[in-house]
């Protein structure tokens, strides 16, 4: 029979008994530390599928702490990309919306010196973007840009 254990890299460090007695908080702290060392301090924002049921926060207020990040929802349909940002009505006069073909910039949110950048899931058109504020949500609607520039790549042997 093949001895799998001799190829297991942690055979001296971990045992089944130790894992059964492990504190879940310590394990979570360890995993977060490793993820942070590999992907950087803001690693959670790099993963599109974070929390399947995110906790909604109250809309941001002008007197809020500068480090507060709004809970931004992004979703797409066949023809459009939607970005929803919870924001209070007082912030509407200060916020400026700009975008490139792949990125949304929310200037003066949460601070004037640091614009919030949101990566879009696909290319969007330069014209035809609409922003609507209703019930504490700023919704930005982009039209998708169809990318028909296809190139064939030769396989070298």
From Swiss-Prot:
<protein>
    <recommendedName>
        <fullName>Spore germination protein GerT</fullName>
    </recommendedName>
</protein>
<dbReference type="InterPro" id="IPR008978">
    <property type="entry name" value="HSP20-like_chaperone"/>
</dbReference>
<keyword id="KW-0309">Germination</keyword>
<comment type="function">
    <text>Involved in spore germination; probably required at the earliest stage of germination.</text>
</comment>
């Amino acid at each position: 029979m093949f001895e799998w254990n001799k190829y297991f890299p942690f055979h001296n460090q971990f045992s089944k008994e130790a894992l059964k007695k492990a504190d879940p908080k310590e394990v979570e702290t360890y995993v977060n530390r490793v993820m942070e060392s590999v992907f950087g301090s803001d690693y959670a924002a790099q993963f599109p599928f974070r929390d399947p049921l995110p906790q909604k926060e109250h809309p941001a207020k002008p007197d809020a702490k500068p480090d507060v990040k709004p809970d931004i929802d992004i979703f797409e349909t066949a023809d459009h990309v939607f970005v929803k940002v919870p924001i209070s009505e007082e912030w509407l006069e200060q916020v400026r919306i700009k975008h490139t073909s792949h990125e949304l910039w929310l200037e003066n949110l949460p601070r004037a010196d640091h614009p919030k950048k949101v990566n879009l899931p696909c290319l969007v058109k330069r014209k035809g973007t609409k922003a609507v504020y209703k019930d504490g949500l700023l919704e930005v609607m982009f039209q998708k840009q169809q990318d028909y520039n296809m190139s064939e790549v030769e396989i070298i042997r």
